[in-house]
Each structure stands twice: as structure tokens, then as C-alpha cells.
Amino acid sequence: GLGDVYKRQVYGLTELNQDKIKSARLIAVPGCYPTASLLGVLPLLNKGVQIESILIDAKSGISGAGRKAVENGLSVEINENFKAYGIQGHRHLPEITEIVELVSGYPISINFLPHLIPAMRGIYSTIYVQLKDLENLDFQNLYDSYYTDSPNVRIMNSEEVPDIKSIANTNNCNISVNKSNIENQVIVISSIDNLVKGAAGQAVECYNLMYGFNQSTGLDNG
């Protein structure tokens, strides 16, 4: 039945489940918003840091709405425009919440609000993580260490800020992490191409791992 199928699937976020993907036969490839959001918070979830809440302010290029929406005039509607949607709930929030709580091991209050921006492609997530205590953590080192073996994730230094132009048409994710001016809060910015790292590119990564190829085969950015 469907329940058995669900139990057999492996969540296809390579930065989280690389070993499980290698032996899997059924992969659930993450959505574009969950990919950017989860890559932004994963290093904080299993380091003994107590997270009180996560606020994800996410923006997407119009291709995220699908080809039909673009052909039906969305590109004209959003030109020189900017708007939120899914305010009452978005289908990707349960996916984000499930993985965050699975990795952290405890319930975390998560608020997620997506927006459409006047660009064709790209996901840009600004993530506010409220911690119980910063505990003098070196966040730059924490993120660098977590993603040291992840070929498609780049942790930027504190003087740099991700954008969507630099990751367009690539399978990369750029991340910055900084302390907020609010006590015990961290601001993480994560950017990906919704059509590559947020979709087809990630599926290729999973295929490569399942069949013994290098994770980045066919995805190298020339």
C-alpha cells in the first residue's frame, strides 16, 4: 500500500542523507523552498543548540509557479512588482517542519512565508533562528565544518551576502550566517536556483549516488 511506499522512501537531500541515498531505491526529492530553507538551518539542528523558533522569509522567481502560470501572464503581472502568497499556509511548510523536527529531535515553532519577485529563477531565503542561548558558538566555523564535504554548498564570509544572480543556472547553494542585533538570534541567508539545486539538479545528484557515480557528475558548472 501507499503507507509501505512512504516508509521505503528516502528524503533526497544529499547534504543530509548521502549514505541512505546510496542504498535507496525510492527517493523523495525535496521541494525548492525546503531545499534552500533546510540547507540554511541544518548545521544548527544537531549541535546541542536549543532552537526556540524559526522564521523563514522566502522569495522565488516566477518559474517556481510553473510553466502554465508564466505563459498565462504571471511574468507581466509580477513585472516591477513584488508580493507575498500562501499566507494561510503553503504546501512546503509541512515538509520543512517534518525534516527540521526529525533532525533536531524536538518540536520547533516554524513560520514560513513565500513571496514572488520579478525574476525568472532563483530562491532567496532569509531565515531568522531564535536560540535559547548562543553559547558563544562560532557559527562561521560550525557551517564551514558541516558542509566541508558538500561540493555544492558554499559558506560565505561575514562580509559577503548571497544573491540569486551568482547561483542562476548552477547546482550551487550560497549561504551566509551572522548574529542578529536581537539577543540570541542568528540570521541565515540561503540562495539556490529553484530549477537546478531546487529540482532537476538535486534529482541528478540522487541518481548519481544511487548508481555509484560522483555526486556532481553532469552538474559541474563550466
Predicted features and spans:
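Short, small-residue-biased leader/transition segments that mark boundaries at the very start
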Residues: 2-6
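C-terminal substrate-binding/catalytic lobe of Rossmann-fold NAD(P)-dependent oxidoreductases
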Residues: 52-53, 62-188
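C-terminal helical cap and adjacent loop that interface with cofactors, partners, or active-site loops
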Residues: 21, 164-222
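Secondary-structure boundary/capping motif
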Residues: 36-37, 135, 198-199
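Residue-level signal for short, function-critical loop segments
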Residues: 32, 131, 194
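Rossmann-fold dinucleotide-binding core
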Residues: 7-96
